[in-house]
């Protein structure tokens, strides 16, 4: 065991105690203060070289971050399904990007541990929240994880997305290696569905469930305006499995009763193994100030 004093200018010194496990290329330990409060610490040795490569992990992985069941349809909690796209290189190098369930864009990089773990820590919302935890990439090309997400208050005076924040939530993370296909999933059609985030009370809600024809070039074409009055469109990126779309919703104004348009934007990732895509949509409230934005779940289904 190695004990390292960590001096601080205020609050007393800290003590870092580490135990190294050379055979496992890892270490564990604790970081404690003078009052014996402590947190656990773990890490791994950087083992990847041009000789000992991470080629057995090297790929693009699409993972989703879903709320646990008790948080479903809780209006004070963002209801979108977040996602991360993780690119793993041959020397353990990783780059990842995605969105959280409130539409917040996330991006970062790091080093894959020898056992396929990828730690993530992001400070968000002007340091009033975070996204932190570990992705686990397995040799069977699946992704799981233990990641938590929180927001304690508005990030700025202009913040209009779940302004009061929400307590720490442990997300359900699943995913797989992305396998490019033409067309994706070998499908000829893909269908949309939307849930939560206030979408069910929209006047045109039932018209959002649409089925598009999928070409061999991965172009998704929806019917004309007579059967697709919200003009839903989706663009697929077959190399990564990302999908991005929009629709225009028309509701009566809550005061004037005149038709009022709102743009529903959404994005997500496809899962080669599950043959389904999940993601997050953003929906501005009807124009009664202040206009706030709610989020919910979007799903793209193959037959």
What are these regions (language model features)?
Residues 1-303:
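Mature soluble binding/inhibitory domains
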